[in-house]
Swiss-Prot record:
Protein name in UniProt: Osteocalcin-related protein
Primary subcellular site in the record, as a coarse category: secreted
Source organism (scientific name): Mus musculus
GO cellular component: extracellular region
Post-translational modification: Gamma-carboxyglutamic acid residues are formed by vitamin K dependent carboxylation. These residues are essential for the binding of calcium.
Task performed by this protein: Binds strongly to apatite and calcium.
Residues the record lists as binding Ca(2+) 2: E66, E69
Residues of the propeptide: 24-49
Record gene name: Bglap3
């Protein structure tokens, strides 16, 4: 176990102390790895928030409205007092 630890430590020290100055790429291929900000923006098009919603959001009261339309008493009350009041009077549950 000590031998393995010692070999790992020596390998790490050799890696840290090695001369890495010649590791930088040279030539025309090295410039292809990087691009300017303008070229990067052309590649990645961000979603614009101001273009409008893609799908309108559903009405949260639609299931309640459909249920109240099926009951004639609730439908009549909703025409007179509003959907929330009619639903509360008929079913006794707040929306």
């Amino acid at each position: 176990m000590r031998t393995l630890s010692l070999l790992t430590l020596l390998a790490l020290a050799a890696l840290c102390l090695s001369d890495l100055t010649d590791a930088t790429p040279t030539g025309p291929e090295s410039d292809k790895a990087f691009m300017s900000k303008q070229e990067g923006n052309k590649v990645v098009n961000r979603l614009r928030r101001y273009l409008g919603a893609s799908v309108p959001s559903p009405d949260p009261l639609e299931p309640t409205r459909e249920l109240c339309e099926l009951d004639p008493a609730c439908d009549e009350l909703s025409n007179q007092y509003g959907l929330k009041t009619a639903y509360r009077r008929i079913y006794g549950i707040t929306i």
